[in-house]
């Protein structure tokens, strides 16, 4: 068994692992990265964020082609199969792997491909694909192994008609009808993707409102858009059993209803990838969802072992995971780059997309905060009229006395980009965080960014 010595060993090369490894390396530490694949990037690059967003982009282009009257002059609407669209999206994965591989090489981070597990608190055994075991000894170790779809034991995921959000990328045909169980972020994103391909979608939600953490007006807008695009949303439903057939699948619900479709996509929760880490060898224990507990410095109960990303739970976003990894390494090397990551914008890549940051109306009402609302509807924006993306709105919540911006909520094209302007103002200290910034600033014209000016005037005009 070969033995290698490092200052820091990072388990997992997804966003959290990459952020941790890069920050530790730039602080002068000798760093090793361990990943179970033969390529870096983690589930984010290979099965999650990158392929699903590339898929979405391709589907959005198809929708634009099929709905734009200008293109009718050159032909009829075109139909694309899911495998064809996926093949186009997969090209992005190889480009991401190449970019990320170069980051590790440039920063002198050694990458080991194999399954890593703790031998003790300062050493990790890596079982390579050829069976060779290598031992990495380190002063500090960061767990950033990510997560995978939660799979209930009573569902046969080996059935050819039953998929989760990882295996759906191996779907070799375009179903006429698809059941999606779980209406969280992933479920809603895939509902948009498949409905955009003309698939009838049954979206089963075990709550009474889609994405209930969102501002209710935004959630309602998404619900309306789904119902207008061949997505049947069924609220307050729980599965009883899933019956796989040769020609389809039947979802039996506890309410007594039955739904039949060509395939079922399970999108109900995720599990941390901790079961093969040998946590028992260092006295750590994951919770029922495979997640480990950390403090605000991202340190576990074992003083030299840290955690970041999906494996520690909330918010389970790639954007947050990268910053958590950087912060875990910053805390570890004490280079001033540590911060507890909690001011995270939400980005949901439905069609149209959704993004928000800060408080929503329900939260402010419950807290008895005297707030006011300003809105800008995209249908009135010149840039939206030019692009044809006229569905959507920007909503600003602000304190009616101090004018402090308390929340920004956006539904529509480029929402995940638009929200960052509001995020920047909300992060300003004291009186610099004010809705007046948007009326005292000149925006390029025509842009979607000027929706902030329109929404700010709308809100300020409500004051008396």
Swiss-Prot record:
Its cofactor is FAD. Binds 1 FAD per subunit. Keywords: Cytoplasm, FAD, Flavoprotein, NAD, NADP, Oxidoreductase. HAMAP family: SthA. One of its GO terms (molecular function) is NAD(P)+ transhydrogenase (Si-specific) activity. It is found in: Cytoplasm. It catalyses: NAD(+) + NADPH = NADH + NADP(+). SUPFAM superfamilies: FAD/NAD(P)-binding domain, FAD/NAD-linked reductases, dimerisation (C-terminal) domain. This is Soluble pyridine nucleotide transhydrogenase. Its EC number is 1.6.1.1. GO terms for biological process: 2-oxoglutarate metabolic process; NADP metabolic process. Conversion of NADPH, generated by peripheral catabolic pathways, to NADH, which can enter the respiratory chain for energy generation. Its main location: cytoplasm. The gene is sthA. FAD binds at residues 35-44. It comes from the Bacteria. GO terms for cellular component: cytosol. Gene3D superfamilies: 3.30.390.30, FAD/NAD(P)-binding domain (3.50.50.60). Belongs to the class-I pyridine nucleotide-disulfide oxidoreductase family.
